[in-house]
C-alpha cells in the first residue's frame, strides 16, 4: 500500500480552531501529516510569535491530526520538505504563500509534489480564528 505524506506549515502561535481545521483538512489529503512549525526568527510577514518555538512544536505535535511535528530550518524553508519528500503540501486558506511560487521553487529543487490550499472554516459568532485577534481581545479585556 502506498502511503501519501502531507506537509502543512505555519507559525501556530496561540492555537485556535482555525489551526485545527487547517490541520484536519491537510490530514485528509493523505495518510501521514508532517507539520513544519516556523522558527520565530523566520516569521517576517506578521508580528513575531509570542509562544517560544519548542512550545509551539510541542502543542502542534499533541493535536490529533498530526503524525509528526518539527521546527523549520533556520535558513531554508525547503530543507525539511526535501527531507520529508511529501506527496502534498497543504497551504492554509489564508496563508501568505502563493501556490505558483511554491510550485516553482519545488520544480527548481526537483521535488515532485502537489500543492493544495485548505478551505476556510466558517466561524460562529463568538469564535475567534486568528492569533492576532485573540491577542487583541486579551489586551482589550485585560487593559
Curated annotation (Swiss-Prot):
<keyword id="KW-0288">FMN</keyword>
<dbReference type="InterPro" id="IPR014729">
    <property type="entry name" value="Rossmann-like_a/b/a_fold"/>
</dbReference>
<dbReference type="InterPro" id="IPR004821">
    <property type="entry name" value="Cyt_trans-like"/>
</dbReference>
<keyword id="KW-0285">Flavoprotein</keyword>
<comment type="function">
    <text>Catalyzes the transfer of the AMP portion of ATP to flavin mononucleotide (FMN) to produce flavin adenine dinucleotide (FAD) coenzyme.</text>
</comment>
<keyword id="KW-0548">Nucleotidyltransferase</keyword>
<protein>
    <recommendedName>
        <fullName>FAD synthase</fullName>
        <ecNumber>2.7.7.2</ecNumber>
    </recommendedName>
</protein>
<feature type="binding site">
    <location>
        <begin position="11"/>
        <end position="12"/>
    </location>
    <ligand>
        <name>ATP</name>
    </ligand>
</feature>
<keyword id="KW-0547">Nucleotide-binding</keyword>
<dbReference type="InterPro" id="IPR024902">
    <property type="entry name" value="FAD_synth_RibL"/>
</dbReference>
<dbReference type="GO" id="GO:0003919">
    <property type="term" value="F:FMN adenylyltransferase activity"/>
</dbReference>
<dbReference type="GO" id="GO:0006747">
    <property type="term" value="P:FAD biosynthetic process"/>
</dbReference>
<comment type="similarity">
    <text>Belongs to the archaeal FAD synthase family.</text>
</comment>
<dbReference type="GO" id="GO:0005524">
    <property type="term" value="F:ATP binding"/>
</dbReference>
<feature type="binding site">
    <location>
        <begin position="16"/>
        <end position="19"/>
    </location>
    <ligand>
        <name>ATP</name>
    </ligand>
</feature>
<dbReference type="Pfam" id="PF01467">
    <property type="entry name" value="CTP_transf_like"/>
</dbReference>
<comment type="pathway">
    <text>Cofactor biosynthesis; FAD biosynthesis; FAD from FMN: step 1/1.</text>
</comment>
<comment type="subunit">
    <text>Homodimer.</text>
</comment>
<dbReference type="InterPro" id="IPR050385">
    <property type="entry name" value="Archaeal_FAD_synthase"/>
</dbReference>
<keyword id="KW-0808">Transferase</keyword>
<dbReference type="GO" id="GO:0046444">
    <property type="term" value="P:FMN metabolic process"/>
</dbReference>
<feature type="binding site">
    <location>
        <position position="94"/>
    </location>
    <ligand>
        <name>ATP</name>
    </ligand>
</feature>
<keyword id="KW-0274">FAD</keyword>
<keyword id="KW-0067">ATP-binding</keyword>
Amino acid at each position: 500500500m502506498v502511503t501519501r505524506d502531507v506537509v502543512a506549515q505555519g507559525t501556530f502561535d496561540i492555537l485556535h480552531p482555525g489551526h485545527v481545521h487547517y490541520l484536519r483538512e491537510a490530514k485528509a489529503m493523505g495518510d501521514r501529516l508532517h507539520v513544519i512549525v516556523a522558527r520565530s526568527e523566520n516569521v517576517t510577514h506578521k508580528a513575531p510569535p509570542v509562544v517560544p518555538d519548542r512550545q509551539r512544536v510541542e502543542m502542534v505535535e499533541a493535536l490529533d491530526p498530526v503524525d509528526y511535528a518539527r521546527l523549520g530550518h533556520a535558513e531554508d524553508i525547503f530543507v525539511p520538505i526535501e527531507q520529508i519528500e511529501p506527496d502534498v503540501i497543504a497551504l492554509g486558506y489564508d496563508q501568505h504563500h502563493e501556490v505558483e511560487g511554491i510550485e516553482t521553487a519545488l520544480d527548481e529543487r526537483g521535488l515532485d509534489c502537489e500543492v493544495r490550499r485548505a478551505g476556510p472554516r466558517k466561524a460562529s459568532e463568538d469564535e475567534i480564528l486568528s492569533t492576532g485577534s485573540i491577542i487583541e481581545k486579551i489586551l482589550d479585556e485585560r487593559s
